[in-house]
Structures are given as structure tokens and as C-alpha cells.
Amino acid sequence: FQSSLKAQSFYDIGTIQEIKIVFSQSNWDYMLDTAKSGGEGYVMAQTVAINGTIFDSVGVKYKGNSTYNANQSKNPWHIELDTYKTQDYQGFKDIKLSNVAKDPSFLREVLSYEVARKYMVAPKSNYAVVFVNGTQIGLYSNSEAISKTFVKQHLFSNKETFIKCNPPAGAGPGTSDYPNLVYEGTDSADYYAGYELKSDHGWHDLIAFTDTLKNHITAIEELLNVDQTLWMHAFNNGLVNLDSYSGGFAQNY
């Protein structure tokens, strides 16, 4: 089983990946919950085995907002293979596992990405079964992370401006700092609450883009692939992908 999986791509739609996490700490769930409530720091797993390939000293944390709950046993995961040492699996360092919350069909995320990739650049996605300290936690959707590796593969460079459009403090009812591409003026500090800069530079580019979008719309095609953007809006609306730029919090892109 494991040898056949190793021969396949990690995101091959026809295979279910096997991920086995081992913590040396018996209170690993409490530690992950504590890390999540305190700013989403990583907890070190003793080992993580992916289809039989074993990695030691791996960063692991719970992810998600509405899909995470400290009182449930099946929470979404973010596994970062290179938190503490340089290592990867088939070139992938970040592994994002969703717990398929509120989707009894188990199809929504994986099928949606299958549709999206026909019209635009989008992550690959399949399934993985997860074990922790020998106990099976369940079946997860396994979707490719939008990382610098992903950007380099599809845009042929990871040295340019790279911005995660999620408020660092989180978005939700009662908050108003949304990454909605509204022009907030020329002071980069006015954008810090709504966006997370993942590259060494880029605030000036974000400001220039939002300024163009508001004040110089006839020049927008110099900065934005309008055709791909329209496909993105069609996808978000057609498949009711509201946890996106098209949703109320205008995030997760």
C-alpha cells in the first residue's frame, strides 16, 4: 500500500494519502488547543510519516476558524515539515488538511478545486487519512497550500510581492479590518490590520493596486488579469464559495 502511494503524486486524485503523526507529549491535544488560542504557534511532533516516509521534528498546529472547535476530536491541521529543519515531501513543505466540516458528502472542497482548475490556477486536492499516536482521527481533504512553492510553480517566481489577504487578528462579526482592496491612502500602516505581508517588500505595490482600482480603473489591466478575475468571481458565486473575496469578510485569497 505505502510503496504504491510513494509512486503517486501527493495530490493525485485517485489515491488516499496516509499521514501518521506521533507526539511525545501525552497532552498533545491540549497543547494544540492552547497554541491555537494564543496565536497559532506550532507544536513539535516527534515524527510525521507520510505514506511511510518518516520526518522527525515537525511543526504541527490546528487551523481554521468556524471549522475548529476545542471540544471536537477531528480538527483541521496545518503540518509544516520545515519548521525546525530543512525537509520536504515531493517538494511540498506545507500540508493543509481540512476536516470536511458541515459537508456530509465529503466532496465539496475536492470537487470544487477540480472545477476551478479548468478555468484558472488553483490548488490540487485529494484526501488523506490521519492517525495520531496510532489512533485513526478520520478522513480529511488534502489541498495544496498557496505557498511560495505554489507561486513559483505557476507564476515562475517567488521573489515578487506576496500578500496573504487575511486579517492577522482574524475576521468575523464585530471586526471591520477586511482585505477588501479598498484604497486606504498612501500610508502603509493603514493596511496592516487587513493584510499579512509574506514577502520582504510589497506594501507599496498593494497601495498602488488599490489606488488604480479606485482612481485609475482604465489602467487596471496593467496590474490585474481581468479575465482570470472574472472566472474567479463566477466560480465563487456559482459554487457559493463565500469564505473568499466574494464573501462578507472578503478574505482567504
Regions found by a protein language model. Give the residues of each.
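Regulatory N- and C-terminal appendages and interdomain linkers associated
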Residues: 4-57
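TRNA-binding/sensing appendages of the translation machinery
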Residues: 8-12, 20, 98, 104-114
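A short, sequence-level motif marking secondary-structure junctions
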Residues: 25-26, 59-68, 142-148
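Zn2+-dependent metallopeptidase catalytic core
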Residues: 45-51, 55, 107-121
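Internal "kinase-insert"/substrate-recognition segments embedded within catalytic cores
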Residues: 78-86, 99-100, 118-127, 132-239
